[in-house]
């Protein structure tokens, strides 16, 4: 079997796995595809399949971690130390899984995808992805490990931003998605609501001013991300009044291939 037909088969198997909601296998198939980029860069479809596969695998664990952390806080506030001890061990198991998933995609990005990227759009996509998965590590790591993950996130997002501002239109869904996640990083990880709001507002305003230039093919994705930027601005500017009232929303599944938006740590 030629490498071309093998790559084509793995892409098809990844699509089957997605339909069957077998996302761990979808990751495996797309990892095989990603390791062939030395001969030919991933297509937009392949890139999106890889992103969706990892997004679902990591998303399930992030949701589990938030639920368990919330229960841990409640048990701790009630003084149930025996339960807290059990929960900490269980949370540790989830964190091990999260670390393994993040390390997997980060290694793939560093060794194969980023070096092989030639187009500005691809570079921004992969650097944004690198920032995203370092951010997911920063969500649950503590101490020096959290600091390191946060610094790596900032470097990746800034590198992506430099290219996006120079080469992608303000309405481009990948540029908008980067602004969305970069602003979430400032808000959640660095606790800098001013920087978060400033970044989100600038991205939204710049996109609005060029909305009439938006092509039909990306209109839905771009306007949906713009709506999420606006929703977050509304939430963040009112959070002092009701800090635990609302969650920062996840992007709907239909634009997962473009972007994903983080949620805050569990409310007290």
Curated annotation (Swiss-Prot):
Keywords: Cytoplasm, Nucleus, Phosphoprotein. Residues 243-268 are annotated as: Disordered. The modification Phosphoserine is found at residues 69, 192, 267. The modification Phosphothreonine is found at residue 213. GO terms for cellular component: cytosol; Golgi apparatus; mitochondrion; nucleus; plant-type cell wall; plasma membrane; plastid. It is found in: Cytoplasm; Nucleus. It holds the Pfam family 14-3-3. One of its GO terms (molecular function) is ATP binding. Residues 246-260 have a biased composition (Basic and acidic residues). Is associated with a DNA binding complex that binds to the G box, a well-characterized cis-acting DNA regulatory element found in plant genes. May be involved in cell cycle regulation by binding to soluble EDE1 and sequestering it in an inactive form during the early stages of mitosis. Belongs to the 14-3-3 family. Interacts with EDE1. Interacts with DREB1A and DREB1B in the nucleus. Interacts with CINV1. This is 14-3-3-like protein GF14 upsilon. It comes from Arabidopsis thaliana.
